């Protein structure tokens, strides 16, 4: 990455991003907070993971986070986006990921949480997001990632789950949200991630998928999510993590992507936006920092492309008893 360190290149303003994340948490009356209230659990996961990648998780009160998190658990075992809301598989994964960051998985009634997730599997192997039944390969990934962290994959039919994901594969090598749906980088991350976690990557046509994914890089260096769309920092996560999982990351220009991400920073107040000059938000701050982690940017911890958690956390949770 020698060209990334040329003199005119802006640097990662890590301390400002840390301050931005800590402030975003405090500003409960802000417009962003009101709009995001129902998905606070997901926002907390993005913010806390970013802090951990920057080695600053110690700046938040673990006790405060965990006591709030536990108020979001529903009697079914699933977690809601905030206190008093309905449970959903996405917030359940976020809650489990946050507890993983703090090495506190064991405070959970693991049997109850894993049963909530397992009950969302359908006869054809697919997963619904909650009791209302929407089906999407996002939920297949979420279920598999969550149950893998909880070491409860045996509670679902993994073979059928994999078969359903493979039925969402397209001729271009990509994956969609349901069988026959158009390939999209976000869904590709979900399908490739779920296949990686279950040891099923042999179902992926790595060359055609790698080709489709590397075509997402535009002239300015940023990546888009499908043909004809604008580049967006979040695809530095969805596309790059997928390329890494299929060993094709060397097919894109990494230095140009680093520059695109760094150009999306608010150098004064911290935070990262979707593209240069747009307003920053907590999601794109995570995607930018996580993207830089995948690009081996100095000073950022290494993130696992399948679990979306720092590698040291994954090693602690998954690879120890
Ligand atoms: C733990 C990393 C992690 C994820 C949890 C929620 C989830 C599982 C995955 C979501 C995957 C997904 C579908 C991401 C895409 C989000 C997105 C930017 C959608 C908008 O796509 P388009 O194509 O619009 O409608 P753009 O903005 O690309 O022009
Ligand atoms: Zn985006």
Swiss-Prot record:
It comes from Arabidopsis thaliana (Mouse-ear cress). Geranylgeranyl diphosphate binds at residues 184-186, 226-229, 235-238. The enzymatic reaction requires the aid of the Rab escort protein REP. Signal peptide: none annotated. Its cofactor is Zn(2+); Mg(2+). This is Geranylgeranyl transferase type-2 subunit beta 1. One of its GO terms (biological process) is root development. It catalyses: geranylgeranyl diphosphate + L-cysteinyl-[protein] = S-geranylgeranyl-L-cysteinyl-[protein] + diphosphate. Binds 1 zinc ion per subunit. Heterotrimer composed of the alpha subunit RGTA, the beta subunit RGTB and REP; within this trimer, RGTA and RGTB form the catalytic component, while REP mediates peptide substrate binding. Its EC number is 2.5.1.60. The modification N-acetylserine is found at residue 2.
């Amino acid at each position: 990455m020698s060209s990334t360190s040329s003199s005119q290149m802006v640097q990662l303003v890590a301390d400002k991003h840390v301050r931005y994340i800590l402030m975003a948490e405090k500003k409960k009356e802000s417009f962003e907070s009101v709009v995001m209230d129902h998905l606070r659990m997901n926002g907390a996961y993005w913010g806390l993971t970013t802090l951990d990648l920057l080695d600053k998780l110690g700046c938040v009160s673990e006790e405060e986070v965990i006591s709030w998190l536990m108020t979001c658990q529903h009697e079914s075992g699933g977690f809601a986006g905030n206190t008093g809301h309905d449970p959903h598989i996405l917030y359940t994964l976020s809650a489990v990921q946050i507890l993983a960051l703090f090495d506190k998985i064991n405070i959970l009634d693991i049997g109850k949480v894993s049963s909530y997730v397992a009950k969302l599997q359908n006869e054809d192997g697919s997963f619904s997001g909650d009791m209302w039944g929407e089906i999407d390969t996002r939920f297949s990934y979420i279920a598999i990632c969550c149950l893998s962290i909880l070491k409860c994959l045996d509670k679902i039919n993994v073979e059928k789950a994999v078969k359903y994901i493979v039925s969402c594969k397209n001729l271009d090598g990509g994956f969609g949200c349901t069988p026959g749906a158009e390939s999209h980088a976000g869904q590709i991350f979900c399908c490739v991630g779920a296949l990686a976690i279950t040891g099923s990557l042999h179902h992926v046509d790595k060359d055609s998928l790698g080709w489709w994914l590397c075509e997402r890089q535009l002239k300015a260096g940023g990546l888009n999510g499908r043909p004809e769309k604008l580049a967006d920092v979040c695809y530095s996560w969805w596309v790059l993590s997928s390329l890494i999982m299929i060993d094709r990351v060397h097919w894109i220009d990494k230095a140009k992507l680093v520059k695109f991400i760094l150009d999306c920073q608010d150098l004064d107040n911290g935070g990262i936006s979707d593209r240069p000059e747009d307003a920053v938000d907590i999601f794109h701050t995570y995607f930018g920092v996580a993207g830089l982690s995948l690009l081996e940017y100095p000073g950022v911890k290494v993130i696992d492309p399948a679990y979306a958690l720092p590698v040291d956390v994954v090693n602690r949770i998954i690879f120890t008893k």
